[in-house]
Amino acid sequence: MSITKNVKETKAVGKYIRLSPHKVRRVLDQIRGRKYQEALIILEFMPYRVCSHIKQILESAAANAEHNDGLNKNQLFVSKAFADKGPTLKRFQPRAQGRAFPIHKPTCHITLGVSEL
């Protein structure tokens, strides 16, 4: 007989963020499984541009958990964190002798889930 604990998970999603999903995953791997407050401190002091976007989404997920599910922010941890590839913006860079080189500007969708300890 197995005992299952009913765990509420609340999530927040940031869509069409103009950053490479590869660079976003580098930061998400650092906060996955950490406590909410600890993850905020890590994001505050990491030198990457993506940290501000992830911090905003994490705060939104915590606010959703507190408001919608009645969970305590001090008891939350990052249960789920992943970045999916979004649509790529395609642009052209003019080059010498009438040529044009394609430029691909990637976007991503960031999903963060928080649960209570």
From Swiss-Prot:
Cited InterPro entries: Ribosomal_uL22, Ribosomal_uL22_bac/chlpt-type, Ribosomal_uL22_bac/org-type, Ribosomal_uL22_CS, Ribosomal_uL22_sf
Keywords: Chloroplast, Plastid, Ribonucleoprotein, Ribosomal protein, RNA-binding, rRNA-binding
Protein's GO biological process: translation
Alphabetized Pfam families for the sequence: Ribosomal_L22 (PF00237)
One GO CC term on file: chloroplast
PROSITE patterns membership: RIBOSOMAL_L22
Keyword Heme set for record: no
Keyword presence, Ribonucleoprotein: yes
Any one GO molecular function term: rRNA binding
Location in or out of the cell: Plastid, Chloroplast
Assembly with partners or alone: Part of the 50S ribosomal subunit.
Family assignment from sequence similarity: Belongs to the universal ribosomal protein uL22 family.
Protein task: This protein binds specifically to 23S rRNA. The globular domain of the protein is located near the polypeptide exit tunnel on the outside of the subunit, while an extended beta-hairpin is found that lines the wall of the exit tunnel in the center of the 70S ribosome.
Protein name stated in the entry: Large ribosomal subunit protein uL22c
Record organism: Pyropia yezoensis (Susabi-nori)
GN (gene name): rpl22
